[in-house]
């Protein structure tokens, strides 16, 4: 997968290009990332990339020309790549969206600054707008890093074992189950005995039931959009009965 990033602060991306899962993916060649700074595409001695908005108002807007030229330069190596603008007005990024983006071999990310970019650039150059939530940040770099990290995890070979991605929260529409490691007993709390049993089928069912239970308790809205299979439905009903029995016994 190849990602081209357009940003005024490419140095910020060292947090994911040099460390952790994404850093290893880049070093191994599974993910390729390059950067284009709009300041390098300005034509004045001050390298001006922003200007005042027409109609007045607070803040500045990023100018079209430096961004447009940066996008054109990025497209020289990835001519068929979609251009994605990170914006609070975009489609909210979910695991489903991450999986869709991961099917693309290449894309260009535009990280805005100030009060945003000239609308005419969005109309002429941007293919998709994505948001990481209903809140405002100082720029698009952090959302771009979030998107890059999430999508990189889906690239075959990045996590070593594909099961790691398949079992993440939201990969099947559910929250993840609880996990435990040594010691076996911590502050009087033991690891659930089923996880020590060696019975892989029972462990699988326990984990699935815990995922359903946690989703039911913490994010019931997610279940409204899922078509549970017969096993999932039975396990969820079993958990609900157990919860009701426990409540009535108190």
Curated annotation (Swiss-Prot):
Is Nucleotide-binding tagged as a keyword?
A: no
Q: What is this protein called?
A: tRNA (guanine-N(1)-)-methyltransferase
- Assembly and oligomerization: Homodimer.
In its UniProt entry, the species of origin is given as Marinomonas sp. (strain MWYL1)
* Alphabetical keyword list: Cytoplasm, Methyltransferase, S-adenosyl-L-methionine, Transferase, tRNA processing
Give the superkingdom in one word: Bacteria
According to its UniProt entry, the function of this protein is described as: Specifically methylates guanosine-37 in various tRNAs.
What PANTHER family does its record include? Answer: TRNA (GUANINE-N(1)-)-METHYLTRANSFERASE
Keyword S-adenosyl-L-methionine set for record: yes
As recorded in UniProt, its EC number(s) are: 2.1.1.228
Q: Which GO terms describe its molecular function?
A: tRNA (guanine(37)-N1)-methyltransferase activity
Which CDD domains does the UniProt record give?
Answer: TrmD-like
Q: Where does the protein end up?
A: Cytoplasm
One of the record's GO cellular component terms: cytosol
Catalytic activity annotated for this protein?
A: guanosine(37) in tRNA + S-adenosyl-L-methionine = N(1)-methylguanosine(37) in tRNA + S-adenosyl-L-homocysteine + H(+)
